[in-house]
UniProtKB/Swiss-Prot annotation:
Keywords: FAD, Flavoprotein, Monooxygenase, NADP, Oxidoreductase. PANTHER family: L-ORNITHINE N(5)-MONOOXYGENASE (PTHR42802:SF1), MONOOXYGENASE (PTHR42802). Gene3D superfamilies: FAD/NAD(P)-binding domain. Homotetramer. It catalyses: L-ornithine + NADPH + O2 = N(5)-hydroxy-L-ornithine + NADP(+) + H2O; L-ornithine + NADH + O2 = N(5)-hydroxy-L-ornithine + NAD(+) + H2O. FAD binds at residues 65-73, 84, 150, 446-448. NADP(+) binds at residues 238-241, 307-309. Binds 1 FAD per subunit. This is L-ornithine N(5)-monooxygenase. One of its GO terms (molecular function) is ornithine N5-monooxygenase activity. Pfam families: Lys_Orn_oxgnase. GO terms for biological process: biosynthetic process; intracellular iron ion homeostasis. Belongs to the lysine N(6)-hydroxylase/L-ornithine N(5)-oxygenase family.
Length: 475
C-alpha cells in the first residue's frame, strides 16, 4: 500500500512522492518500512541476496535497480569473449560450495554440465556467466524493484539534535518519473561504477558519435547501420576493453578502419600469475586494510598490472600478429585496417558538420598538441569507471560523514560500514558500501573475486548492528 504525498517545497519543482507503507511486521520506530534497502542489483547485491537466502536470514529487504532487468556489463558482452577469472569465483561457491546458486548447479539445471566439462576450461564465456547471474536473479523477483533510480539518501532524526535513527531514500521511476520515498535502518550501496570520461571532455557536451564503452553494443548498430560501410573508428584506452572493442569492430564492419589511441608507451600484458593472483583472495583484504595510507598506495601501484590498463597476453599477441601481417601485406600505413597510436592523450574533440569527430591529441613526451590524422565516424571511450557515491546519492550526508586525513571524501570500517562523525547516527543504523572501497580494501573491491565471501561478512556486520528489542534474529 502507498500514500500519495505532494512535495510542497516552495523552491523545488512540484512533484508527487509515493511513500511506501510498511504493512504487517512494521518496525515500532515510526517511519521505518524496511530492515535493509540495497541500492543496486548487480553482482555485488545479488551475492548479498544469495547469502541471505542460503543462510535463511529473514528480513524486510528491498533491492532498487535502475535497469529494467538484471544485466551485467551488457554493453560489453562481446560474442566469444571470456571471463578473466575462474567460474569457481562465482556468487556462492567459495562461501558455500553446496549452495543452489553455484555456477556448476546453474549448468546442471540448464543440462550443460557435462558439455561444459568437455571444454576443459575454468573460463566461461561472458555471455554465459551473465546468463548464470540472470538465472540467480530470477529467484529474487519479489525482493527487487527494477526501473528505480535512487536520487538521495538522508539521515532522519526523530528528535532534533539527537543521533539519526534511520535513513530515508528518494527513488525515481525511470519510465514515469514518479518519485517514491522509502526508509530503512540499514542501507547497502552497491550501485556499481559510473562511466569515467576523460576530465578534459567531461566539461563539454559530447556528440552522439562519442560513446563510452559501457554502451558499445547497444549503440554501435544504431549509429552505424551499414555492415559494409567504410567507417572509421577511434577507440581511446589501452586496457582489455579497448582492445576487445577494436577487435570486435573489425569483425562487424569488414571495410572499417580502426585506430586505437592510448597514452601509454605500449600495450601491456596483465599479470595473472598464481602468486600475484593471491591479492584477490578474500583473506588478503584483512592484510591490506591493516596497512597505513602510504603502504596502501604503494601496494595498489605495485599491483596495478593485474587490473588497470592491461591486456591478457593471448589477445595482446594476436593484435601484434595482426599488425605485423598488415606491414608485409601493405607497406602504406594509410591503408591499414588497424592502427595503434601510443603516447597520445586526448585533449579535446571537434564535431564536424557531417557528424564526424576530429580528436586533439597531445604527445605525452613532447607535450605538443595536434589534430588527429583522420576524422572518425564513431569514437569509443574505453576509459573505465569512477566510483564515489558521496558525490551523488549520498551527498546529503556529506556534512556528517567522517572524512579521513588523506583527502578522501569518506572512510569505511573493515566491515565496509561508512563511518559517520561521532554522535551523528545511532549504532543500530548504518550504511555499507560495496565496490567503492578500493583505496581501503584493495584491488579486489570492485571485482567478482570476493563477492561470495564479502556478502556474508557484510550481513554479519548488519545483523550485529541491529539492537532493536523486537529483533532477535540470529545467524
Amino acid at each position: 500500500m502507498e500514500t500519495v504525498l505532494k512535495n510542497d517545497c516552495s523552491h523545488c519543482q512540484e512533484s508527487v512522492i509515493l511513500r511506501e507503507n510498511g504493512g504487517a511486521g512494521r518496525s515500532s520506530n515510526t517511519g521505518i518500512q524496511h530492515d535493509i534497502i540495497c541500492v543496486g542489483f548487480g553482482p555485488a547485491a545479488l551475492a548479498i541476496a544469495i547469502a541471505m537466502r542460503d543462510r535463511g536470514i529473514q528480513r524486510r529487504v528491498r533491492f532498487l535497480e535502475r535497469q529494467p532487468e538484471f544485466g551485467w556489463h551488457t554493453g560489453m558482452l562481446l560474442p566469444g569473449s571470456k571471463m578473466q577469472i575462474s567460474f569457481i569465483k562465482d556468487l556462492a561457491t567459495i562461501r558455500n560450495p553446496r549452495s543452489h546458486f553455484t555456477f556448476l548447479n546453474y549448468l546442471h539445471q540448464k543440462d550443460r554440465l557435462v558439455h561444459f566439462t568437455n571444454l576443459s576450461t575454468h573460463l566461461p564465456f561472458r555471455e554465459e556467466f551473465n546468463d548464470y547471474m540472470k538465472w540467480c536473479a530470477s529467484h529474487f523477483n519479489d525482493w527487487v524493484q527494477y526501473n528505480q533510480e535512487v536520487l538521495s539518501v538522508t539521515a532522519v532524526e526523530s528528535t532534533p539534535g539527537r543521533p539519526a535513527e534511520y535513513f530515508k531514500l528518494i527513488s525515481r521511476d525511470v519510465r514515469s518519473g514518479e518519485l517514491r520515498e522509502l526508509s530503512a535502518n540499514h542501507i547497502i550501496v552497491a550501485s556499481g561504477g559510473e562511466p569515467a570520461i576523460p576530465p578534459i571532455l567531461s566539461t563539454q557536451h559530447l556528440p552522439k558519435t562519442v560513446i563510452h564503452s559501457s554502451t558499445y553494443l547497444g549503440s554501435v548498430h544504431h549509429l552505424l547501420q551499414e555492415k559494409n560501410g567504410s567507417y572509421r573508428f577511434a577507440v581511446v584506452g589501452g586496457g582489455q576493453s579497448a582492445v576487445e572493442i577494436s577487435e570486435d569492430i573489425q569483425s562487424r564492419y569488414a571495410n572499417s578502419k580502426v585506430t586505437l589511441v592510448t597514452k601509454a608507451s605500449a600495450l601491456k600484458p596483465s599479470d595473472d600469475s598464481p602468486f600475484v593472483n593471491e591479492i584477490f583472495d578474500p583473506s588478503s583484504v584483512d592484510k591490506f586494510y591493516s596497512l597505513d595510507h602510504s603502504a596502501r598506495q604503494q601496494t595498489l601501484l605495485e599491483n596495478k598490472a593485474t587490473n588497470y590498463g592491461v591486456v591478457r597476453l593471448p589477445l595482446l599477441e594476436s593484435v601484434y600478429e595482426k599488425l605485423y601481417r598488415q606491414k608485409f601485406l601493405e607497406p602504406n600505413p594509410a591503408k591499414w585496417p588497424f592502427r595503434l597510436v601510443t603516447g597520445r592523450e586526448v585533449m579535446g574533440l571537434k564535431e564536424l558538420p557531417n557528424n564526424q569527430i576530429e580528436l586533439q591529441l597531445k604527445d605525452t613526451l613532447s607535450g605538443r598538441v595536434e589534430s588527429s590524422a583522420e576524422v572518425y565516424d564513431l569514437v569509443i571511450l574505453a576509459t573505465g569507471y569512477t566510483r564515489n557515491p558521496i558525490a551523488t546519492m549520498l551527498k546529503p550526508l556529506e556534512q556528517i560523514v567522517e572524512a579521513p586525513a588523506d583527502g578522501k571524501t569518506y572512510c569505511t570500517d573493515r566491515d565496509y560500514r561508512l563511518r559517520f562523525r561521532q554522535g551523528k547516527v545511532k549504532r543500530d543504523a548504518g550504511i555499507w558500501l560495496q565496490g567503492c572501497c578500493e583505496s581501503s580494501h584493495g584491488l579486489s573491491d570492485s571485482l567478482l573475486s570476493i563477492l561470495a565471501v564479502r556478502s556474508s561478512e557484510l550481513l554479519d556486520s548488519i545483523l550485529a548492528s541491529s539492537k532493536r528489542a523486537e529483533d532477535h534474529a540470529r545467524l
